[in-house]
Structures are given as C-alpha cells and as structure tokens.
Amino acid sequence: LLLLLAHFAAAAVAPGLAKFLNRRAFLVLALVPAAAFAWLLAQTGDVTAGRSIVEDIAWVPSLGMDFALRLGTLQWLLGLLVTGVGALALLYCAWYFKPDDPSLWRFTGVFTAFAGAMLGLVLADNLLALYIFWELTTVFSYTLIGHNPVRSANRRSATQALLVTTFGGLAMLIGTV
C-alpha cells in the first residue's frame, strides 16, 4: 500500500518538481517505480515459496466492503514488469522532452500517477480495488495520450482511448452487479 501511496504522493509534487528541475524531474520521479521494483525483487523468496502478501483495509465494514491488495506469484511477475517499464519510461522521458515543453509539468504528474494506478491494478485482490484502479488508469491514459491538446490527432486518440476503456469499465461494473 505504501508503494502505491508513494506513486500518488510523487504525482502530487511532480508538477512543482518539473517547474524547478525541468525535465530532470523525470530522473527523480523514476526513483518511485524503481523503489517499487526493488521491493518486489526483495519479495522473490517469499513469493516463489508460495507465500502471498495481503493487505486488506476495511472500507465500509457494515456492508462487508474492503479494499484488498495481494502479492502472489502472478502479481509479483506483473508488478516487476509494470514497475520496471515505468521506471525506464520515466528515465527515457528525461531525454525525450524538450526543456521548454509547455506540457512537461502536467505530464510528469500524470505519468507517475498512471504508473501507480497500473501497479494498483496488478495488485488488486477484489473487485472494488480492481474497479477503482481500472477507472484511474482510464482517466490517466486519457490525459497522457492527449497531453498535447494542440494536436487534433492527440485529442482524437485520447477520446478514442477514453471511450474504449470507459466501455470496458462499464462492462466490468455490469458484470459485478
């Protein structure tokens, strides 16, 4: 849970960090998924031995609703993939973006939050957590794809991604009800 919160906390401070460090902010932000990757690697022994790590937070106890995260073998493997690619992508962004890019400050926060939402999606252990992280990835992918609103192709692609993931989320919601 702390790894997820670290992603969202970093996303909250990322715009200010980008205004201060410019594109070098990506190098600092890459430390968050890299730390998650390192933590996942440290869990290799437990996970390969068949032990799961579970975090269960009561959300609405009277309705039996909780927010559950689990790290089993599949989640561990996908978590390594998500955090590893997330860290590498953030490192690449430090060289990809131009120093004077006006959308840099917005992109840093959204990308870091997206990386956290993807990790949450991988670790989700019940439908409530899965649905929350699915919807977060929907919103963040829309803003990432459309990060340059001046280009009509970006706006069109972002809208298409929003529609596809929203319909997927609606299908998931209908399936759970």
Predicted features by range, described:
Residues L1-V177:
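...captures the hydrophobic TM-helix bundle architecture rather than a specific catalytic motif
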